[in-house]
Amino acid sequence: MDFSQLGGLLDGMKKEFSQLEEKNKDTIHTSKSGGGMVSVSFNGLGELVDLQIDDSLLEDKEAMQIYLMSALNDGYKAVEENRKNLAFNMLGNFAKL
């Protein structure tokens, strides 16, 4: 590889990363717990965009806390897994050059 091309290559990767981040923002990851009594949705940037709690849980604070923690943790894991996949794909594209 010609090192004089490295700057252009890095600029290209930066642009590709920005495009992937923008596209990723529109990706939604939904996790449920308690048999669907709690549902959380995150966009690809890790921002919580929706939270649904079944009305029957409003009387059972402890169960609601457990289900919320479970759904949130699963949602965060899905977002992180997606980020890893994007990073590996970018590195794979870089290796091809």
UniProtKB/Swiss-Prot annotation:
InterPro entries: YbaB-like_sf, YbaB/EbfC
One GO cellular component term: cytoplasm
Subcellular location, record wording: Cytoplasm, Nucleoid
Molecular function per GO: DNA binding
Keywords for the protein's UniProt record, in alphabetical order: Cytoplasm, DNA-binding
Family matches, as Gene3D superfamilies: Nucleoid-associated protein YbaB-like domain
Family under the similarity heading: Belongs to the YbaB/EbfC family.
Subunit structure: Homodimer.
Role description: Binds to DNA and alters its conformation. May be involved in regulation of gene expression, nucleoid organization and DNA protection.
Name of the protein: Nucleoid-associated protein HP_0035
Organism of derivation: Helicobacter pylori (strain ATCC 700392 / 26695) (Campylobacter pylori)
Lineage, highest ranks first: Bacteria, Pseudomonadati, Campylobacterota, Epsilonproteobacteria, Campylobacterales
